[in-house]
């Protein structure tokens, strides 16, 4: 078994100021997105659409606002609505954590629609340009989760080569044992807990880096190298992220205040299903629209 390094959550100490890893990873993610965007400017069809480096910089401003505001509101509404409705001022305590990708996604989508309206572009043209830039940011964010030792995976077989012990999960591990006697006996987890005071878990943050970050980036980047029907790149992002997140959630520990919901699925899975359906519908619409336009022009 591998023991999580239990990194110091503060990356840089500057006198009384502390730069935390999670915030630093957000910065790295946005910088990586800018780099990917500038690489895309070199594609002939992208240049023909009139995109510029200034457009990317402006989109990042909108993207940051959409990510932070949407991510926070999404967490409040999707995950802990009852608590925050009872403690409304706690909504503003972002330093205590609590961000939702799906909320951030909606926030960024609205921000890009506003950007498109201001630049007099179709909003799908904007999201098609932005979509390949997003996975690098997702990977950076999940790396921040891993460094912080948070959002760990479900308990797994201690003999598995990927099994990892997370010091931050000690309390959850102790509470897990009496609820799963069959697995405790099958995997001899009582002995493991006696020795380490922790249980082996999936490092699901690394799975998310691999699927939602690296794999999704290459799929989108390669797909977007050639001109596609308007909306197709955005659709592929919806499908790709939805499938990746839905899959990884089987190895990720559900939020303790929600647990598993209907059909044994987590909140993350239920929020990903509409993304997949919308992505498939948008992909079909995009290619049918291009075919209809081609027939009309013939």
Swiss-Prot record:
It holds the Pfam family LGT. GO terms for biological process: lipoprotein biosynthetic process. It is found in: Cell inner membrane. The keyword Zinc does not apply. PROSITE patterns: LGT. Keywords: Cell inner membrane, Cell membrane, Membrane, Transferase, Transmembrane, Transmembrane helix. GO terms for cellular component: plasma membrane. The chain crosses the membrane at residues 17-37, 59-79, 97-117, 230-250, 257-277. One of its GO terms (molecular function) is phosphatidylglycerol-prolipoprotein diacylglyceryl transferase activity. InterPro entries: Lgt. A 1,2-diacyl-sn-glycero-3-phospho-(1'-sn-glycerol) binds at residue 142. Its EC number is 2.5.1.145. It is a multi-pass membrane protein. Pathway: Protein modification; lipoprotein biosynthesis (diacylglyceryl transfer). Belongs to the Lgt family. Catalyzes the transfer of the diacylglyceryl group from phosphatidylglycerol to the sulfhydryl group of the N-terminal cysteine of a prolipoprotein, the first step in the formation of mature lipoproteins. PANTHER family: PHOSPHATIDYLGLYCEROL--PROLIPOPROTEIN DIACYLGLYCERYL TRANSFERASE, PROLIPOPROTEIN DIACYLGLYCERYL TRANSFERASE. This is Phosphatidylglycerol--prolipoprotein diacylglyceryl transferase. It comes from Burkholderia cenocepacia (strain ATCC BAA-245 / DSM 16553 / LMG 16656 / NCTC 13227 / J2315 / CF5610).
